[in-house]
Curated annotation (Swiss-Prot):
Disulfide bonds join C32-C51, C40-C99, C50-C175, C107-C167, C245-C281. The keyword Phosphoprotein does not apply. Rnase which modulates cell survival under stress conditions. Released from the vacuole to the cytoplasm during stress to promote tRNA and rRNA cleavage and to activate separately a downstream pathway that promotes cell death. Involved in cell size, vacuolar morphology and growth at high temperatures and high salt concentration. This is Ribonuclease T2-like. It comes from Kluyveromyces lactis (strain ATCC 8585 / CBS 2359 / DSM 70799 / NBRC 1267 / NRRL Y-1140 / WM37). The active site is at H92, E160, H164. The gene is RNY1. The keyword Cytoplasm applies. Glycans are attached at N42, N134.
Length: 425
């Protein structure tokens, strides 16, 4: 799929001039004070949640470099259709992380969506002079630059909004009411999330940043971690950029960290250095394979694989988890399945059902009535299970005798704190 010249010109204008306004509404009834500090830098409480992003005050613009094509695909046009332009990274998403590096996910079920195509084709986002970009034009650039490694791009868009977009408080319906926005505020938030995510993605042209430093996709060449890090800093105001490699030692993810001044709608992103997360790339001999290359070590995924079976033990104490997700000391631990989620992270499942985290009290539960299967982190080296960027778990009581103890995400000074360790069967 190729963008026509007229649309490309409008997108270039969109990426450079359309977002200078404090808000996108000409007849705004509400605005944010220009004296507000950047997110995660305040010393006193900012009460107006429509003008200050908290607790998710660190905005990550994340990018993919997917290069392995579907089986049998080698034609350049088909490669672009599946993997995006051959000379560009693709968008992964816009994530509101907390100031300490943890994050929330799937924050508001009432705001969840199951469709993007029809929403962006809605009359609310097309044929108006006051729109930064028409919904149909936004959809076309997303089709080109926001690609899924599963081949189902819209499912990735829906996932990114439901997991991350619903956690951005300055896009909540009450804020749109303050600004006197006509139309459906839920739809408006979705439109704004995707247009701002695409705008920031276009501002961070990783491919050209690396190319300017002499780093280009190649089957033969390799690079050092320092070379890549120094190059990426040049494209991020001298701040450290987080990057990751795949199992073949090839560069495949870039994370740009920002703080934010005011509402997300003001788009006043301030580049900051990446929070310490640790890159999995080696110090030397990092590959950056061109799109279309299939490494000799590649093995196609088995679509019928149910996940990795194992048990979940208390990492620094006695006991294990049973089938409902509770901590127990006696008998036999339950079988858990660690299942790769389609767009990153993992699901946990027992014979009772998928495991989830209750947003109100952070309790872990595994059963068929779980409304939203949680996405967990997994540290393959240590075996630890994490949630929302942290690997801390606790219980408020010790499960003596035949007692079961509910397990909660996080830590508690008055509770029993531990890690959860997945042990493969």
């Amino acid at each position: 799929m190729l963008l026509n010249k007229g649309l490309l010109a409008s997108l270039l204008a969109y990426t450079t001039t359309a977002f200078d306004l404090q808000h996108i509404f000409y007849k705004e009834q509400y605005s944010c004070p220009i004296s507000l500090p950047a997110s995660c830098s305040n010393n006193t409480e900012i009460k107006d949640s429509c003008c200050f992003e908290f607790p998710g005050g660190i905005m990550l613009q994340t990018q993919f470099w997917d290069y392995i094509p579907p089986k049998g695909v080698s034609d350049p046009d088909e490669l672009v259709r599946h993997l995006g332009p051959l000379d560009s990274f693709t968008n992964h998403g816009l994530w509101p992380d907390n100031c300490d590096g943890t994050y929330a996910q799937f924050c508001n079920r009432e705001s969840n969506i199951d469709d993007v195509w029809h929403l962006l084709n809605d009359d609310q986002f097309n044929g108006r002079d006051d729109l930064p970009i028409n919904g149909t034009d936004l959809l076309e650039t997303m089709d080109m630059y926001w690609k899924s490694n599963t081949g189902d791009d819209e499912s990735l868009w829906v996932h990114e909004y439901n997991k991350h977009g619903t956690c951005i408080r300055t896009l909540y319906p009450d804020c749109y009411k303050k600004w006197g926005v006509a139309g459906n505020s839920k739809k408006q938030a979705v439109y704004d999330y995707f247009r701002i995510a695409m705008k920031l993605f276009h501002d961070k042209d990783t491919y050209q940043t690396l190319k300017s430093a002499g780093i280009e996709p190649s089957v033969e060449k390799s690079y050092t971690k320092l070379e890549i890090s120094n190059a990426l800093k040049e494209g991020h105001s001298g701040e450290v950029v987080h990057f990751l490699c795949d199992r073949h030692g090839s560069l495949n993810q870039i994370w740009y960290f920002h703080s934010l001044k005011g509402s997300l709608l003001g788009e006043k992103f301030v580049p900051i250095s990446a929070l310490p997360k640790g890159s999995n790339c080696p110090d030397d001999n990092i590959k950056w394979y061109p799109k279309g290359h299939v490494p000799s070590s590649y093995r196609p995924p088995n679509g019928n694989h149910p996940g990795t079976r194992g048990v979940v033990r208390i990492g620094n104490g006695k006991g294990f988890l049973i089938k409902n997700g509770h901590w127990y000391l006696k008998g036999t631990p339950a079988n858990f399945f660690l299942i790769e989620a389609p767009f990153g992270n993992y699901y946990l499942k027992t014979r009772m059902g998928y495991c989830g985290i209750d947003n109100s009290n952070k309790v872990l539960a595994c059963n068929k009535n779980v409304a939203q299967a949680a996405q967990f982190e997994y540290d393959a080296k240590k075996g630890y299970i994490g949630y929302n960027g942290a690997y801390d778990w606790y219980a408020t009581k010790y499960p003596r005798g035949n007692q079961q103890a509910p397990v909660y995400a996080g830590s508690n000074d008055d509770g029993y704190n531990f890690q959860l360790k997945f042990v493969k069967a």
